[in-house]
Design a protein with these regions (language model features):
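Non-catalytic substrate-recognition/targeting regions of SAM-dependent transferases
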Residues: 48-64, 70-137, 144
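Conserved SAM-binding motif I beta-strand of class I
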Residues: 179-184
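Mobile active-site "lid"/loop adjacent to the S-adenosyl-L-methionine
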Residues: 186-189, 211-215, 228-259
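S-adenosyl-L-methionine
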Residues: 190-230
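Conserved SAM-binding loop of SAM-dependent methyltransferases across substrates and taxa
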Residues: 166-178
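C-terminal catalytic and target-recognition region of SAM-dependent MTase-like enzymes
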Residues: 268-328
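Conserved class I S-adenosyl-L-methionine
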Residues: 156-162
Length: 328
């Protein structure tokens, strides 16, 4: 297996036993994973040292989170490959999906909480409902991307992080030198993000922590006349607000992107949208960002994001990201 960085002008990419595919962008940088007759084009979060997807099989993935092994369900894993790795029989935690919906954890010598590090960032992990641990490791590929943009901007950058969860993107942006407004509707998630900031040595960083409805917050920022140089959003596929409001990403994502353009500064740096909904293909993210950010000079690229799988040497898809970046 080989990893290649390829900078491609307008052209066709050809590979044996694969159909030709057109790339309709002026210039694109992609990471290619090539294994014999397999060509995978996606953004891969392969900078982890303490996290690893060891294997995938029968609707589940075997992961290493620091010193501990977890088995969790994954809807992308539709293949039934042999489970040869001994970790399948020696896990520290196993999330069992219920036929009635949801599920529950089964633990084997797993602490209530432990730490995981990515470069200079530290995250507090603790398994909780809906199979989660408090971190989405695949997002590291985006942290690296916008962290470099912020560090090379040569000016102060003001970032808005919507649906900010436990703060992975917030901490990555703050560590790169940005001032960040972190917004999430869950008080528990915001407090967890604050704990991660403290563990990462970023307690004194210019981060504004807000428990709020993201759409309503943006609407108020428009009325206040506040603006941001960069926007990050990681909306859920489905959600319900405290007053019964229903969020469906297919219906709400485009209006929210459009709304957010009203709080962009005159010289925005980037706009990042993440999606874990299979119906929102990368091309859909590209279309929305390209149309709504047309007044600003920039380029758009979208792609699946993924995590390398040790046993197979392939990549587990983990959603998609759309990136708009200033061309100035």
């Amino acid at each position: 297996m080989a990893f290649l960085w390829i900078h491609v002008p307008i052209s066709r990419i050809w590979y044996s036993n694969l159909r030709k595919c057109y790339i309709k962008m002026l210039y694109i940088s992609y990471k290619f994973t090539i294994m014999k007759e397999v060509l995978i084009i996606m953004w891969i979060a392969d900078g982890w040292k303490e996290y690893e997807v060891i294997d995938t099989s029968k609707g589940e993935k075997l992961e290493r989170w620091g010193d501990y092994l977890l088995v969790r369900p994954d809807p992308q894993v539709i293949w039934d490959t042999p489970r040869k790795n001994r970790g399948w029989k020696h896990m520290n935690g196993h999330y069992h999906r219920s036929s009635r919906g949801g599920g529950e954890w089964e633990f084997f010598d797993l602490p209530h909480q432990w730490e995981l590090h990515y470069k200079d960032l530290t995250f507090n992990l603790k398994p909780f409902s809906f199979k989660h641990t408090g971190l989405f490791p695949e997002q590291a590929v985006n942290w690296d991307w916008f962290g470099e943009k912020i560090r090379n901007a040569g000016r102060p950058i003001k970032v808005l992080n919507l649906f900010a969860y436990t703060g992975g993107a917030t901490l990555a942006a703050a560590a790169a030198g940005a001032s960040v407004t972190h917004v999430d509707a869950s008080k528990g998630m915001v407090n967890w993000a604050k704990e991660n900031a403290a563990a990462s040595g970023l307690s004194g960083a210019p981060i504004r922590w807000l428990v709020d409805d993201c759409v309503k917050f943006v609407e108020r920022e428009i009325r206040r006349g506040n603006h941001y140089d960069a926007i990050i959003m990681d909306p859920p596929s489905y959600g319900r607000g405290p007053k019964g409001e229903i969020w469906k990403i297919e219906d709400a994502i485009h209006p929210l992107i459009k709304l957010c353009t009203k709080i962009l500064s005159d010289d925005p740096l980037f706009f990042l949208v993440n999606s874990y909904t299979t119906g929102l293909a990368p091309a859909v993210l590209t279309y929305m960002l390209a149309t709504e950010l047309k007044p600003w000079k920039g380029s758009v690229e979208s792609q699946e994001i993924g995590l390398p799988v040790t046993e197979s040497g392939l990549v587990l898809p983990c959603g998609a990201s759309g990136r708009w970046c200033s061309s100035r």
